[in-house]
Every structure is written in C-alpha cells, then in structure tokens.
From Swiss-Prot:
Low complexity composition bias: residue spans: 426-447, 510-613, 636-652
One protein family per Pfam: SRI
Native organism: Dictyostelium discoideum
InterPro entries, per database record: SRI, SRI_sf
Sequence ranges of Acidic residues compositional bias: 20-37, 60-74, 112-121, 143-166, 179-197, 232-260, 268-286
Stretches assigned to coiled coil: none
Protein's UniProt name: Uncharacterized protein DDB_G0283697
Cellular-component GO terms for this entry: chromosome
Signal peptide: none
Length: 853
C-alpha cells in the first residue's frame, strides 16, 4: 500500500539525522575546552546543556511518532477486516432485498424503517413460520409442525450467535432499551397484521392483470436464481427456501381466487360509498360558499348605505370643511371602485375579453383578415367601454339612491358635481393663462385673445350686433349663421328682488362720490379715504359692524340696528349731536358737503341688543363687499386713457342708482365672509382694540395697577401702541388677542407696581383727557371693592398714522366692570353709547377670565 511505504521512508530519514547533529555539536565542545576566559566557558556550557536537551526531546518525539504510526496501521487493518465482513453481510442483505422485492411482492416500504436489518430478518422468518403453520393446519400434519418448530428454534439460536459476534455494539444498545422493545414488538405485530391485509388486497388487484404471464416470469426467475447460486455459495440454503416459498405462493394464489372476487366486490362498494361522501362534501362546500357570498354582499350594501347616510348628515358650513369632505368622498369613491374591480363579475368579464383578444389577434394572416380582426377588436373595446360606463352609472345610482333621504342624497350629489365643475374651470383657466404667456406671438397665429369687457356690459348697456360690421364681399355661410343666431334685444337682467326701504344704499353713495371725485379731491371728507394709497379705505363698508359677525362682541343681536352707525367722525358740519338719523339717505347728504371741519365729539357706536321695534332685518349683510369685488377689477380698464366710462357714468339715469346685485355674487360673498377674518373701519378698529386691551389689563388690576387713572392711561397707551404697529391693517383675527396679551404680559413681567408719573411717555397735560366727563368720578362708591369704573380712551394726533395729516380725532369707549376680590372675574360689561337719537345702556354677560380668550 502507498501509505505504508511513506511511513518506512520517514523512519530511515529519522535514523540518519541524529548522528549528523552529534557531529555538529561535538566540534564546538573541543574548542570551548581549549579557549581561555571564564565568561566564555560559562556561556558555552549553557549552550551545551540546551543542545543536549533539544537532542533528547527530538529523539522522544521521533519515538512517539513511530508508535502512533504503528497503532494507526493496526487500527486500519482491523477496520479493513471489519469493513470486508460488513460488505459481505451487506451484499447478502441487498441481494435478499432485491430477490424478495422481485419474487415475493410481499414487503412494503414500511418494513424498511430505522429499526435495522436484524428486525427485518426476524420478521421475514416469522412470516415464513406462520405460512407453514397455516398450510399444515389445513393438511392436518401436526407432527411435522412440531419438528419444524424445533428446527426453527435451533436455526434462530445459530443465527443469534453469529450476529452477536458481528454486532456487539448494537446488542449493548438493545440491552439498555429492553424494556421498551417489548412494547414496540406488540405494536409491530398489530401493524404487521394490518399490513398483511393491505398486501392481500393489493395482490388480488395485481393477479387479475398478471395471470397470463405468470408462468413465464416464474421460469425466468428460476433461471436467474440458478445463475446467482453459482456465484453466491453462501446463500444456497436461502435460495432453496425462496424456491419453496414461490411454489407455496402459487398454491396460495389458486386458493385465494374466490377470496379475491369477494374482495373486489367489497372494494367497489367502498369506492362507491367514498364517491357519494365526496359528492356530499362538495355540495356542502358549495352551499357554505354561497352563504358566505350572500353575507358579504349584504354587509357591502349596509356599508354603502351607512356611507350615504353619513355623507348626507354632514353640514357643508365652510369652504375648508367642504374641502375636507370632498377629499373624503374622493377616497370613498376610490374604495368603492376597488370593491367593484375585485368583484367576480368584473374579473370574469375582463377575462372573457382578454381570452377573446388572445384568440382573435394572436394569429397573423392576410391584410383583409387583419382588417377584420382590427374591426372586431375595436368593437370589443367599444363594448368594454360601454360596460365600464354602465357599471359606473349603476354604482353612482346605488350610492346616491336609498329608501330614505333621497332629497339629501340628491343635494350631496349636486354638491359633488359643482365642486368637480369648479375644479375643471379653474384648471382650464390656469392652462389658458400659461399657454398665452409661453406661446410666441406670431402674426399668422389665429389664437383668440380674450379681452375684458368694459364696465357697461355688466349693466344693461347692451348693443345688438350690427350686420353692417361684416363686409358683404367676405360673407360666408358661417358668418350668416352667426348673424342669424345673434340676439336683437338685450338679455334679461336677473336681479335680487328687494324692496326699497331695505336696499343697500351704499351703492347710491358710491355713485355720488364718483360724480364728485372727478372735479375735486377736497369736495368730500370721505375723499381722503377713497384713495388707493390710503390703507384705511373702508368708507364703503357700512354693514360690517354687526355684532353677530364680529368675533370680539359677545352679544347676540336679532336686529340690524347694530350693523348701521352714523359715520360722523369725518363729516360733522351739521353738528350731529343735534341732527342725526339712522337713515342712510341723510348720511349721503352729509357726505356730499364741502367742509372739512371735524368736531371732537364722543361718537359712540351702537353695539347693543337693542329691542327697538323699527329695525331693519339683517338679510343681506355684505352686499357692499360684493359690489367692491365687481367694480375693483374694472378700474384698470377705466384708467387706461378711455373716458367713455366716465361719460357714461355721468349720463346715467336715476333709475340706474337703484340697481341690484346678482344672486350668484351674493352667495359667493356670503360664503367667503364666513372664512375670512373680520375687517373694521378706523373708528371701529380703535374701539375693538381698546376692548381687548381693557379685558387683558384687568388681570393686573389691584396687583400691579393700583389706581384707576393708571389703568386708564395704560389702556390708552396700549391701544395706541397696537394701532401704530398694525400700520393700517384693520383686520382682527383669532391670534390678535393672544398677541396683545403677550405684549401686556411681557410689559408687567419685571414690574412690581406701576406708577404713571414715573413713566417717560406720560404727560401731565393729558391727565384731564383721560377721564370721561360724562361719568361722575368724585363718588367713592365707584372705587369700592365690589365695583370699579374703568374708562379707556384712544386719541390720535397729527403725527400718528391713524388719520390723515390734516385731521385729528378722538374716540372713547367707557367700560364699567364689576369684579370680586376672590376670583377677579368679570360679571358685567357696560358700553355706554352717546348718540343724538339712541342712548342705551348695554349689558353683556361674559364668562370668567379663564374662558374669555
């Protein structure tokens, strides 16, 4: 063998190597003895000792390696002998398995489990014994049975002795598990009986098909066995036994023919029963699937009904809410489309279309056939689109129609359609604008340019198209058709039917102002506020003082007197304390005066729950805003050197002053007013801010503000500060109160007690103006713990940006608050309003300080 030769060569090399090392080591020893010097001798001695130790270690290592190699060789020899024996036994076992599987057809795969080859042999022997016993019982040969049983026992003993020599280790394991083997054997016996019954049935089936060629196969088997017997001398006894078994099996086949017929009949009956059971189970499954589908359909319908009810119950109160609902509806429609897409009908129908396309269009052909295929395909696509349309229409009908609430469903559907239409129109306008800016202006381009029409076309100054405009020699059928379609009379003007006493007279006032503004800028006191550069141009808004629309007034007015006030701060020629009415026509007469004198009167506005019987209904609160929205875009057209509009405005009839505004514009303004913040006039804005400042300063009263005069001065100071910081912005948002509160808190954060005399901004000359003359302050009852009278004033000088440089004005608002020492909460707020005709005391109940913001 090759590995043995290598081991021998290693031994030779190891034997030659030590003497070479001895020669190398002996030479320096002689030199060391002859050399002088003690240091050198000591060093050489150390080297000599180390060399001797290394020599001994090497010799020991070589001996250990030789011993290991010898042990390995012996182990290899033993393993080879064992492997040879195992190979022989394996060959015999494999031969037996092949022979049994081909000839006997009795062993199933369950016999070849992990139990080992020994268990298989024992089973085979036991089966043989059982067969012989059954045969002998039939023949009545009991004596032979006893003899054969004894022979079998002797054979078993011999076999066990042979197996003990070969498989010593396996027997040790079996001895440890002897307790478990007995139980397993009992179970194995039961399994063997069941397997035999199954094998008998299988054999009966095979016999019917293999009766004709059985004899030929048996002859071939015998010839093969003879050849194998010559090659395998050790297995002669087993071969003889197998031949006997084959003969016995042939006899069994003849005896079991009757049994086979009965088994076949029984098997057929069992198969029929199984088929019936399988059919019954399939029917049950179909019924369960149908029930499940019906339940699903019912739940889907209920879901859709609930969705429609939820959608109808919503209130589209503002645009932001409407936008949210629109997004939700869009998501729901997508979910609904997905449900329909996943439904069975949809999938089956699309599958039919797809299969038809594959069958019709996949195969090629001539031009005529391809043309037919193309027509057929187009027809199919048309049918498919029609089906999609019908499905979407049915889906919308199911969505918007229900047993109850059909009108509300119709309303929600109309809302959805309106919103979609608005989106489409806005997108189309944006696309038109973008294309007009980006496209090149070529002379040959026939793009239609949309020019904004003049202001006249909005108001019944309509002219019919004249046929003389188009020249006669260039007339065509298309032009004649246009002239035949063109109207000859002006279209009807759809207007709001309002009675005269309740119409919006601000329109008349605006027309009067326009007539006067072309001649003089100083004719009216209101002309100072009609300029485009003036940020306080709010003279046209007369209906914005309604306490219902103001977020800062907590009163609930059912009448509209609070929405009208006399704008007397800027037109005081007639001494409004003597002659003032609540009628707008008188105000218009006052507005057209030529004097610019402004009297410093305390003109308090009406912000109350007035219970007057003669009050205007608050139907149209924001008509003036709508009119401004219509007229402002047309100012550019009017100012481009075209005086036709001015001439037309000057030559208008008196009936044109009583024009109404379209319904569509009013609806848009009413919707937009809900979401937009509240805007005020200059006078209103001052008073609203003073109210907020007083409300926030109340928190520091009696803690850091000790006197009433200090409180009044601080109210004036903070109102002026806020107005100057706003720089013409007269809108009050939700965040305005928070901003003012933050400013006041930062001011009092580092101060313990406030004294106005130490304040740099305070002037001694202004002390008399802080206190309102209409209130008696001399009494000490007003300064008691139970009630405190507070007046907050706001003044404007020529240097401030609140008014124009030519005019000065003062506004005051007197507020009476009743507070308690423990909670310091407002119980009542009184706004005293001085007017020529209306003098009322208003009480507004408010919540505690924590809930006031």
């Amino acid at each position: 063998m090759a590995p043995r030769k290598k081991a021998v060569t290693k031994k030779k090399t190891v034997e030659k190597s030590p003497p070479i090392e001895e020669e190398i080591i002996e030479e320096p020893v002689d030199e060391i003895v002859e050399s002088d010097g003690d240091d050198k001798k000591n060093k050489k001695k150390g080297k000599r000792k180390s060399s001797k130790k290394s020599k001994k270690e090497k010799e020991e290592n070589v001996e250990e390696e030789e011993q290991d190699q010898e042990e390995e060789e012996e182990g290899n020899k033993k393993q080879k002998e064992e492997n040879d024996a195992d190979k022989k036994s394996r060959k015999h076992d494999e031969h037996r398995k092949k022979r049994d599987s081909k000839n006997r057809r009795s062993h199933s795969k369950s016999d070849e489990n992990e139990e080992g080859e020994e268990d298989d042999e024992e089973r085979r022997k036991k089966r043989r014994r059982r067969k012989h016993r059954e045969k002998r019982k039939k023949n009545g040969n009991k004596e032979e049975e006893e003899e054969e049983e004894q022979d079998d026992e002797h054979e078993d003993q011999n076999v066990e002795e042979d197996e003990e020599d070969v498989n010593v280790e396996k027997q040790k394991q079996q001895q440890q598990q002897s307790d478990f083997d007995e139980e397993e054997k009992e179970e194995e016996k039961e399994e063997e009986e069941e397997e035999e019954q199954i094998e008998i049935k299988k054999r009966s089936k095979k016999r019917n098909s293999i009766d004709s060629g059985r004899k030929d196969k048996s002859k071939k088997r015998k010839s093969k066995k003879k050849k194998r017997g010559q090659n395998d001398d050790d297995d002669d006894d087993d071969d003889n036994d197998d031949d006997d078994d084959d003969q016995d099996e042939e006899k069994e086949y003849e005896q079991d023919e009757d049994v086979n017929q009965e088994s076949i009949v029984s098997e057929k009956e069992e198969e029929e029963d199984e088929e019936k059971q399988s059919q019954g189970s399939e029917d049950e499954e179909k019924q369960s699937e149908n029930e499940r589908r019906n339940d699903q359909d019912y739940t889907d319908r209920e879901r859709e009904r609930n969705r429609s009810r939820d959608r109808d119950s919503r209130d589209y109160s503002s645009r932001s809410d409407h936008r949210d609902y629109r997004d939700r509806d869009r998501d729901r429609s997508r979910d609904r489309d997905r449900d329909y897409r996943d439904s069975r009908d949809y999938r089956d129908r699309d599958r039919d279309y797809r299969d038809r396309d594959r069958d019709h269009y996949s195969s090629g052909g001539s031009s005529s056939s391809s043309r037919d295929h193309r027509d057929h395909r187009d027809r199919d696509y048309r049918d498919r689109d029609r089906d999609h349309r019908d499905r979407s229409r049915d889906r919308d009908r199911d969505h918007y129609s229900s047993s109850s609430g059909s009108s509300s469903n119709r309303r929600s559907r109309d809302r959805d359609n309106d919103s979609k239409r608005d989106e489409k129109s806005s997108s189309s306008n944006n696309s038109n604008n973008s294309t007009s800016t980006t496209s090149n202006n070529n002379a040959s381009s026939n793009n239609v340019k949309i020019v904004q029409p003049p202001k006249e076309n909005f108001f019944s100054n309509y002219r019919a198209i004249q046929s003389s405009i188009i020249p006669t020699h260039n007339k065509s059928k298309f032009g004649e058709r246009i002239l035949s379609i063109a109207p000859t009379e002006p279209p009807p003007n759809f207007q709001i039917p309002l009675s005269k006493p309740y119409r919006d007279d601000s329109l008349q006032q605006n027309n009067d102002n326009n007539n006067n503004s072309s001649n003089n800028n100083s004719n009216n006191s209101n002309n100072n506020f009609n300029n485009d550069n003036n940020p306080y141009n709010n003279s046209n808004n007369y209906n914005m003082n309604n306490s219902n629309t103001s977020p800062y007034n907590n009163s609930n007015n059912s009448n509209s007197n609070s929405s009208y006030y006399n704008d007397n701060d800027y037109n005081n020629n007639n001494n409004n304390n003597n002659n003032s009415n609540n009628n707008n026509n008188n105000n218009n007469n006052n507005n057209n005066n030529n004097n610019n004198n402004n009297n410093n009167n305390n003109n308090n506005f009406n912000n109350s729950n007035s219970n007057s019987s003669e009050s205007k209904p608050n139907y149209f609160n924001n008509l003036s805003n709508v009119f401004n929205q219509i007229t402002k875009p047309l100012e550019n057209y009017k100012n481009n050197g075209k005086n036709e509009n001015n001439n037309n405005n000057n030559n208008k009839n008196k009936n044109e002053d009583e024009k109404r505004i379209d319904l569509v514009q009013t609806k848009l303004s009413l919707k937009s007013s809900k979401s937009t913040p509240q805007t005020y006039n200059e006078k209103e804005f001052k008073v609203q801010i003073s109210n907020i400042v007083v409300k926030k300063l109340k928190k520091y009263y009696k803690t850091k503000i000790t006197t009433k005069e200090d409180f009044q001065y601080l109210g004036k100071k903070f109102t002026d500060f806020v107005i100057t910081k706003e720089r013409g912005n007269q809108t009050i948002n939700k965040d305005s109160e928070k901003k003012i509160e933050k400013v006041i808190d930062n001011y009092f954060e580092k101060k313990e007690v406030y004294d106005r005399k130490k304040d740099k901004d305070y002037k001694k000359d202004d002390g008399d103006k802080l206190i309102n003359s209409s209130i008696d302050i001399s009494n000490d009852s007003n300064l008691s713990e139970s009630s405190i009278t507070i007046t907050s004033t706001s003044t404007s000088t020529s240097t401030s940006a609140l008014t124009s440089p030519k005019t000065t004005g003062t506004t005051t608002s007197t507020i009476t608050t009743v507070t308690s020492t423990s909670t310091s909460s407002i119980e009542n707020t009184k706004i005293l309003v001085d007017d020529e005709k209306f003098k009322t005391n208003i009480q507004n109940e408010t919540s505690k300080e924590s809930n006031s913001i």
